[in-house]
Amino acid sequence: MDGASAEQDGLQEDRSHSGPSSLPEAPLKPPGPLVPPDQQDKVQCAEVNRASTEGESPDGPGQGGLCQNGPTPPFPDPPSSLDPTTSPVGPDASPGVAGFHDNLRKSQGTSAEGSVRKEALQSLRLSLPMQETQLCSTDSPLPLEKEEQVRLQARKWLEEQLKQYRVKRQQERSSQPATKTRLFSTLDPELMLNPENLPRASTLAMTKEYSFLRTSVPRGPKVGSLGLPAHPREKKTSKSSKIRSLADYRTEDSNAGNSGGNVPAPDSTKGSLKQNRSSAASVVSEISLSPDTDDRLENTSLAGDSVSEVDGNDSDSSSYSSASTRGTYGILSKTVGTQDTPYMVNGQEIPADTLGQFPSIKDVLQAAAAEHQDQGQEVNGEVRSRRDSICSSVSLESSAAETQEEMLQVLKEKMRLEGQLEALSLEASQALKEKAELQAQLAALSTKLQAQVECSHSSQQRQDSLSSEVDTLKQSCWDLERAMTDLQNMLEAKNASLASSNNDLQVAEEQYQRLMAKVEDMQRSMLSKDNTVHDLRQQMTALQSQLQQVQLERTTLTSKLKASQAEISSLQSVRQWYQQQLALAQEARVRLQGEMAHIQVGQMTQAGLLEHLKLENVSLSQQLTETQHRSMKEKGRIAAQLQGIEADMLDQEAAFMQIQEAKTMVEEDLQRRLEEFEGERERLQRMADSAASLEQQLEQVKLTLLQRDQQLEALQQEHLDLMKQLTLTQEALQSREQSLDALQTHYDELQARLGELQGEAASREDTICLLQNEKIILEAALQAAKSGKEELDRGARRLEEGTEETSETLEKLREELAIKSGQVEHLQQETAALKKQMQKIKEQFLQQKVMVEAYRRDATSKDQLISELKATRKRLDSELKELRQELMQVHGEKRTAEAELSRLHREVAQVRQHMADLEGHLQSAQKERDEMETHLQSLQFDKEQMVAVTEANEALKKQIEELQQEARKAITEQKQKMRRLGSDLTSAQKEMKTKHKAYENAVGILSRRLQEALAAKEAADAELGQLRAQGGSSDSSLALHERIQALEAELQAVSHSKTLLEKELQEVIALTSQELEESREKVLELEDELQESRGFRKKIKRLEESNKKLALELEHEKGKLTGLGQSNAALREHNSILETALAKREADLVQLNLQVQAVLQRKEEEDRQMKHLVQALQASLEKEKEKVNSLKEQVAAAKVEAGHNRRHFKAASLELSEVKKELQAKEHLVQKLQAEADDLQIREGKHSQEIAQFQAELAEARAQLQLLQKQLDEQLSKQPVGNQEMENLKWEVDQKEREIQSLKQQLDLTEQQGRKELEGLQQLLQNVKSELEMAQEDLSMTQKDKFMLQAKVSELKNNMKTLLQQNQQLKLDLRRGAAKTRKEPKGEASSSNPATPIKIPDCPVPASLLEELLRPPPAVSKEPLKNLNSCLQQLKQEMDSLQRQMEEHALTVHESLSSWTPLEPATASPVPPGGHAGPRGDPQRHSQSRASKEGPGE
């Protein structure tokens, strides 16, 4: 080819260097406009699309060195269906076929094989441009040296860029999953977060939107591929290209992925239906397929014909045809089977699924923002220049002529291009003939492909046999797993039986050891009894100190409980705050959504306002021109219409640009908002999950609360039963000793409990920290937590009710304890009879205490063992899962190996077929060479004809220019005439208007004067009649006569002036009528002149149209010439390339044979390795199964041990709980036991004497036994004389055996009683726990009651103080009143009724008690639990007594007052005695009534 394609490669290189917004550094200057201005924008859209899909892709034309990085060959040669016309183009290929060349290049082998194959397929690459067409203007081709330099530079640079790019993209994509083929909206939130899930858009879907300029003319070789340089307008389009959808954002590897066969078949077929017929068929016809795919491709070509006929535009889109070849090859490469081939990146195989994926939305938005910033200034400059052109075209008078000249230039370009089209359509028809021949070859090749399908059937049968083997292996695996499960079940059963037998054995051993220990302890206890009494006294003092410590601990626990309640309330307040914050955030989100909608509406309204302002600007300019040239309105209507059309087009362009910019801005804003909303949604999802977990925890807490309530009730019942049993079985000494031991154990337990509570406090602090960390998560869970809070409140109410019930039960228990204490006193009398049993039980209790401690140690050790076993079990489970996954991977690898083997067999057959096809290609290439030589000769003849035509065209040009100059002169003269006529017409109209106005004014003035004169005349006539009447009556008055004469003279003057005015009016009317006739004549003359000028204009238009036709024909001929010259140059270069390709193909055949042999050897080695690997994996699987069985046995044994340990642990915990329960009962007994301690010491002394006697008797019995044994031996040695003594000895021995049996029975009974007592102790411990909790709750309640009662007491004290003061005041008043009454005369006293003596009672409350009451309360004792109830009872008693006393006092005062009030009217003193008492009595009554009301109420 010539240097123009190299320049295109340079432009592609510059574009890929600088990105979509940068211009090439050395742009080509255009020879002239290529298309009319009204089609420039359409061409720009198409070119922009091509620049975005091809120019920016790194897999564009001119790429070499694709050997190292690219798809590994599924078979080591190109597809067998290629003939010479479909070979890929070399480094100087046009951009229109970039994708197809790239596919062919990628289907080649590794770096070692690629160099030879690239040379061998040179002619295939360079013959492809004959199938493509690109319309561009011609420039002089570059020199050959410069062309070679450009080619080399482009090739080197593209090789480097491709290597770097592929490695980088593979590193980025190695971790990403394969893309989904689902179709989604680009605004889907899931796709915003996971952009790799977007469907892959084919380049056809992009070019389809902008293929405005397609033509239905059959095409020959593409102009761009024939060596013509691209029009410089592409530089602008690359700059002003807009991003209209996410498909335009596709990164550089999307083309690589599509060309590699990753484009889905449905997308490709859809795109190919919308191609032009010749561009689709040119590639489809050269690839042999199976009959199904052949029919499909014929259908697609027919659909392409129909689509191209429907789309009736008269130009071409080269980018569209280039995309069509890529899409078509995407289908074909899928049918051949190269879609899933792995890629080579630096020698490593990478699966094809990882290529061709989209970048993230973030990268896309950043790139769009950068491009938008780069393009903003240039786009604004273009818009401003267009606005200036609009204003200038509208405002200037010469705009019509300029637009006509531009139209002429555009039409000339159009005719020249149509000439090129005619020349190229001839070549296209020849290409269609070649297509028919190639289709015949394709039918022949399809038969060969059927033979290949039969071979694939045989390989499929072999694959079926292998799959059956895999199924048998799977069946064996299932059988093994079943056997494993059966063995595991058997092992578990055996282990369980073993464990039960072991447990029985251990129990038997423990019983034996206990019996032996009891026998020994009975001997030891005799000696230790003396020491125990001394120890008991010390333990009593220690127990009192321990009790005080326990009470202190109880107070600390209550304070901790209050602190935890305060923390819970603070957390609830924090939760409410977060709920409010959540509501505020939701409102803010709604507000933001509304603001976004308002912004969008504002943008739309701004766009509408912009358009409206532009239209107003245009309309104002048109009004300005119309006011200046109103007379030229009809003459310039056509020019104004053209100007309006052009202005509308430019306005639409500017508005479209602004809409696009606003659209990109809105899309970016929407993307950002959507990402924010997605973040919020994820956060809310997390919060919902946490809320669900919290709800589950709340449900668990509720369940535990219910269980505890049930346990509490059961324990209360058991407690009652146990108390009944205790009354029957306990003795005073036993209860004392057990209480001492129980207090010791309880002290230990309380210490452990304290440690647990401290641990719980630390865990609560940890949970508080966690809650503070999870504040953000709790925002969404607040709504759910409300319901939880309500349920918790209900639970709290239930707990309060439960606490009330428990407090009642506690009081009942206290009463029962009082009763039982009496029973205990009764039982103390029976201690002497049950001393032996008590000693045995005490020994058993000590043993059980030791056993409990041993159980604890065993439980802790076994817990550790269980945790270790759980960890080992988890580890083994994870190893099992890994082994299973490895087994699945081995099966998958085996299947892939079998599939690879069958694929390689198919590839070998295809390679052989392809070698036969290449020989046929050589022959067809030789035929083409002969045809080209004949075509060259015909082209030389055409060239001579073209020279003659150009000379004739030059002469015609000169004539046309002269005619155009003459027409312009005539048009300017005509314009001047029209202007003059218009100015004359306007001046005449103005004069007419002024004269008409003056005439109307004069007529108005005259009519007013006439009316005035008429009115004066009527007045004068009336006066005259009056005077005449008066004159008739009185003829004597001369003065009246004179006045009448004067009036008549006046009347004559007025009539004279009236006649003058009428004459003037007639003259004015005549003058105005003459002027009107003259103006009408002038207007008629002007209209005649206007008609003449219109006829002259029509003649000028006819001349201009003829000139245009001649110029268009001239340009048409020029276009034909250029098209012929281009095709001539292309054919010459194509001929030379075909000659070089013939030699390279022969060398390529030898290379292909070697590669096939190497591939077969490598495949056999891989098969052998896979077999070895499968065998090794099966062996390792069997070993792992054995390991798993052994581990399962171990796990089963560990489970049995864990169950045993759990039982022991439960028994120990029950014992501990019973011990705790008994603690409170024993606390009440401690004081009584202290009193009984002295009695017990005396009894102990007696008991020790009895024990000493028993021991002495035992020693005597043993000595007698030894003596008897000696005597027996002596008697046996002697004659049997002492048979009687032997019988006596036997009888004594039987008695001893009976005593031993009775002792054993007593031991058994004591064991049973010990067990019962242990159970009772465990239940007592549990009761103690529950009572502790209830006591804590009671403490909180009693504290509240205490505060309330203290407040009431303070009120009562205040009332008492006021009552005392009022009482004293009343007494004083009464004494004064009595003294006054005594002083009055006795006569008055005797005449009045005798006054009853008033007796005011003293205050019933003593002064000492009042002082004590009015004093501040004493300090609270340090033992609140013991003293609270007594304090409360005292307070209640005091309140009741105070209230009763106040009521009695109020009644007495009221009675005394009522008895005293009847005396008041009888007394005639001015100040009666009741005068003082009355007003004071009322407040007294009020205060008394108030006190009486407050008393019961309180």
Curated annotation (Swiss-Prot):
Listed result of changing L135A: Loss of interaction with GOPC
Organism of derivation: Homo sapiens (Human)
Keyword Phosphoprotein: yes
Summary of subunit composition and partner proteins: Homodimer. Interacts with GOLGA7. Isoform 1 interacts with GOPC while isoform 3 does not.
MF terms (GO), sorted A to Z: cadherin binding
Membrane topology: Peripheral membrane protein
Domain notes: Extended rod-like protein with coiled-coil domains.
Gene field: GOLGA3
Cellular localisation: Cytoplasm; Golgi apparatus, Golgi stack membrane
Region ranges (Disordered): 1-118, 166-195, 216-325, 789-809, 974-993, 1376-1400, 1440-1498
Site description Cleavage, residues in chain: D59, G60, D139, S140, D311, G312
Role of this protein: Golgi auto-antigen; probably involved in maintaining Golgi structure.
Organs and tissues of expression: Expressed in all tissues tested. Expressed in liver, testis, lung, heart, salivary gland and kidney.
Protein name: Golgin subfamily A member 3
Effect of D311A: Abolishes cleavage by caspase-7
Residue span of region Golgi-targeting domain: 172-257
Effect of D139A: Abolishes cleavage by caspase-3
Regions annotated as coiled coil: 394-1459
Region (Interaction with GOPC): 121-141
